[in-house]
Amino acid sequence: MPKERRSRRRPQPIIRWVSLTLTLLALCRPIQTWRCSLSLGNQQWMTAYNQEAKFSISIDQILEAHNQSPFCAKSPRYTLDSVNGYPKIYWPPPKGRRRFGARAMVTYDCEPRCPYVGADRFDCPHWDNASQADQGSFYVNHQILFLHLKQCHGIFTLTWEIWGYDPLITFSLHKIPDPPQPDFPQLNSDWVPSVRSWALLLNQTARAFPDCAICWEPSPPWAPEILVYNKTISSSGPGLALPDAQIFWVNTSSFNTTQGWHHPSQRLLFNVSQGNALLLPPISLVNLSTASSAPPTRVRRSPVAALTLGLALSVGLTGINVAVSALSHQRLTSLIHVLEQDQQRLITAINQTHYNLLNVASVVAQNRRGLDWLYIRLGFQSLCPTINEPCCFLRIQNDSIIRLGDLQPLSQRVSTDWQWPWNWDLGLTAWVRETIHSVLSLFLLALFLLFLAPCLIKCLTSRLLKLLRQAPHFPEISLTPKPDSDYQALLPSAPEIYSHLSPVKPDYINLRPCP
């Protein structure tokens, strides 16, 4: 019977481990992600022009056609603005997980980069319009586009190849308030067939890939087009800011037209000094999850549920500590985020109330001046002596409002995570930091014990030796029989025994051992 019971109990740990393994595999299954490519420019053609408004007008036409299309009722509405001559295109991004484009080079630089080594961003040769100093190199109009890609956060720096050097475009993916409508020339888009075709393309692909962002692609069958509006355009010579060594790249051509679209040949550079030529890059929406041949990226679920569970099983109490710390950190982070939003709303409401109060005070002062002027004109004194009541002005205290402006974000004032030395931010996730914290704690504890081990051993041994020395010493008692001489030598003599009892010495008694 005992053997049968043992055989029945043996499969239970195996079943537990199998179920635990299946659970971990279910938690770590790959999730399908959407990846989009965003590219500007082409190696086969290049266009140089002077005014950034040309590009913004064309994009404005496309966005306006998209916004007014009946097929895009549920799609996001795109808006456009131009600040300091640079177009800005953005739309409110929905909330979602952090996802990056497959062809994008992700960086964490908050400012635009200059394409020349050692040049400051304010002294970049190609930062603004072309100048005389740019005649010895290629000039490509520098555009800054602020795009809100769906389900994307962070800062991107995308590069594309253009003859001469590799310019950089920085996409700042953060929330921007809706600007007023730009004051661009109102062009009649009825005679522009490409605008309607692009809008139709956007409408069709937006429903097919809702998680993909707008993509500018130079791939066929689309080609760059130049919009001609009330201007006769001719192109000849090496073009604007084109060096003599590359003159064989340029094809000379001329045409006379006042409106419509002109399809230029490849490697054709236009030298246009007026704001009537537009370069329209082809626009399409591509889902790289099916088109890309790259293997899909394996995305795990929350590290709190998968990796921390493995750490808890392997490390024991350390893993449990990491899991609890990661969960508490995640909850505290979400709580701080909500509190920051509420704090910002309260500060905005208080500032608006303060602004309204200042307006009320100014209106009251204006009414007071008007009443005083009216009373004096009618022959009376001012308002206060006439009604025989004290008149007071509202004194508004601005100290508390100033303190609100000096408040730091709640995430900087409340420490919810383990601080690195000198407040270094290594860009690690919460569970990784908690794991490193626990491992370092155990490592430091082990080092502390190793340093104190010799001292502890020495103290313990000295204490034991001291206790052994202070203990009473007893003679050894042997149970084996010894010869008579040994017993006689160990026992005292009779005179020595009776000498303490009486002064009279008794007769000697011969003592012998018992048989």
Curated annotation (Swiss-Prot):
Report one GO cellular component: host cell plasma membrane
Cited Pfam families: TLV_coat (PF00429)
Instruction: Indicate which residues form the motif CXXC.
Output: 212-215
The region annotated as signal peptide is 1-33
**Lipid attachment, kind S-palmitoyl cysteine:** C455
Which residues does the annotation list for site: Cleavage? R301, S302
TM spans (from-to):
436-456
Regions of this protein lying in the Extracellular compartment = 34-435
Keyword list, A-Z: Cleavage on pair of basic residues, Coiled coil, Disulfide bond, Fusion of virus membrane with host cell membrane, Fusion of virus membrane with host membrane, Glycoprotein, Host cell membrane, Host membrane, Host-virus interaction, Lipoprotein, Membrane, Palmitate, Signal, Transmembrane, Transmembrane helix, Viral attachment to host cell, Viral envelope protein, Viral penetration into host cytoplasm, Virion, Virus entry into host cell
Entry keyword Disulfide bond: yes
The UniProt entry, under InterPro entries, shows:
TLV/ENV_coat_polyprotein (IPR018154)
The biological process GO terms on file are: fusion of virus membrane with host plasma membrane; symbiont entry into host cell; virion attachment to host cell
PTM comment: the record says: Specific enzymatic cleavages in vivo yield mature proteins. Envelope glycoproteins are synthesized as an inactive precursor that is N-glycosylated and processed likely by host cell furin or by a furin-like protease in the Golgi to yield the mature SU and TM proteins. The cleavage site between SU and TM requires the minimal sequence [KR]-X-[KR]-R.
Subunit structure comment from the entry: The mature envelope protein (Env) consists of a trimer of SU-TM heterodimers attached by a labile interchain disulfide bond.
Entry text on domains: The 17 amino acids long immunosuppressive region is present in many retroviral envelope proteins. Synthetic peptides derived from this relatively conserved sequence inhibit immune function in vitro and in vivo.
What's its job? The surface protein (SU) attaches the virus to the host cell by binding to its receptor. This interaction triggers the refolding of the transmembrane protein (TM) and is thought to activate its fusogenic potential by unmasking its fusion peptide. Fusion occurs at the host cell plasma membrane. The transmembrane protein (TM) acts as a class I viral fusion protein. Under the current model, the protein has at least 3 conformational states: pre-fusion native state, pre-hairpin intermediate state, and post-fusion hairpin state. During viral and target cell membrane fusion, the coiled coil regions (heptad repeats) assume a trimer-of-hairpins structure, positioning the fusion peptide in close proximity to the C-terminal region of the ectodomain. The formation of this structure appears to drive apposition and subsequent fusion of viral and target cell membranes.
> What name goes with this protein?
Envelope glycoprotein
What would be the name of the gene that encodes this protein?
env
